[in-house]
Amino acid sequence: MTKPFSVVLASLLAITSTISPLASAQQSQPLDRIAAIVDEDVVLQSELDRAVRNVKSQYAGRENQLPPDDVLQRQVLERLILVKLQVGRADGSGIRVSDEELNRAIASIAQQNGTTVDGLRQKLAADGMGYADFRASVRDEIIVQRLRQSFAQSRISVSEGEVDTALTQQAATGSKYHLAHILIGLPEGATAEQIATGQKKVDGVKTLIDKGELDFPAAAVRYSDSPNALEGGDLGWRSLDEIPNAFAQLIRDMKPGQVAGPLRGPSGFQLLKLMEMRDANAGGEKKMVTEYNARHILVRVGDNQTEAQAKAKIDTIRARIVGGADFQATAKESSEDTNSRGQGGDLGWFPADAFGPDFGKQVEGLADGAVSEPFRTQAGWHIVQRVGSRQTDVSAENQRAQVRETIGRRKLEEEYNRYLQELRGEAYVSYRTGDRADNNATAAPAKSADPALPAPPPAKPTR
């Protein structure tokens, strides 16, 4: 059985502002029209309006950190365009989300918001968002996540040498750094004029920050071309192995509150702020975990097998095993998990959370040799037989795994952002709203909405 890639459904609500079920919205909807044509898809004005309202609701009480409405609308529209392009690319790659998967995702979102699916429907209706539109938005976000996963699996690798180097760095400095950044984007193959314009803009933004006319998060919201601009450019806590080598030494020498840059990177000019730093927990302590050895049999649900058919099949298989049939032989004959079927369903040794919480709970609750009742996961219907358990020191193994994951995450962020730039640069985009309205296809401009720095805001925002 392949280990499921963790898709935290709560994070779907933060990827784009279009699907937040708890954001305020006007109940009356204007007559819908097209805001932008994106290849063979469109962004509707209602989508754009709803997304802008949701961003504003997230900044309630901090409205002075938002850019003017026309700039905010352009930023949000560009984000929606990127979502449309990713969904289109995923569709061309055969990435799909079934209705059943979508239903489970929405049920999880409802649960995380302390309600039922029916309650979520009512909340959406009160907020002026149709349930069909909400389903479409959630489907798009799952598709985007799967495209990103596919990209990572095909293009991102981390060598043992990279892990060794990072561990050496960690031994020298175990510090963690809370970072924020502002990106003034440049297109690939930027001309001298584009570079000069970008340099002028980033210098102007830095001046506003240095003079205290804008704090860093507000400047990021107003001027950054990064996908996390609307989050104030916050990059979260990172260790040195999660930071590009070109910036790692610089950040190590900074003090909290300092802003570095402008720095020229592959995507454009950057300003970096060290928000906070802290020492990581000292290593050396053993970490003991319980590992389990188990076998399983999987019956999938899909186009060729309904939920009821799959459940009936797994019930029959379990009855045979309880009646005396050998589990391994039955797994080789009947399991639909191609990865473990040849080994009689053997999954080897693994911690309880390796295959997801539902699977782990079943294994933890069994005695050695016992066979579970049929249970459902995203993969389908299972039965599992626990073979044994043991205590294992995984401190060193975990440390290497964590370092490998952080390096991979950093590489993915860099490469996927470049991929999005390429995707945007190749796209047919025609704006039909605001001061960018046109009737012709446009090549992607530099991601920045403004060619030069606008005038500073009239009032200094609250820090």
Swiss-Prot record:
InterPro entries reported for this sequence: OMP_Chaperone_SurA, PPIase_dom_sf, PPIase_PpiC, PPIase_SurA, SurA_N, Trigger_fact/SurA_dom_sf
One of its Pfam families is Rotamase_3
Please give the superkingdom of this protein's source.
Answer: Bacteria
**Bias kind Pro residues: ranges:** 453-463
Q: Does this entry carry the keyword Nuclease?
A: no
GO MF term list: peptide binding; peptidyl-prolyl cis-trans isomerase activity; unfolded protein binding
Q: Where is the composition biased (Low complexity)?
A: 439-452
Domain comment from the record reads as follows: The PPIase activity resides only in the second parvulin domain. The N-terminal region and the C-terminal tail are necessary and sufficient for the chaperone activity of SurA. The PPIase activity is dispensable for SurA to function as a chaperone. The N-terminal region and the C-terminal tail are also required for porin recognition.
Protein name (record): Chaperone SurA
Q: Which species expresses this protein natively?
A: Xanthomonas oryzae pv. oryzae (strain MAFF 311018)
Upper lineage is: Bacteria, Pseudomonadati, Pseudomonadota, Gammaproteobacteria, Lysobacterales
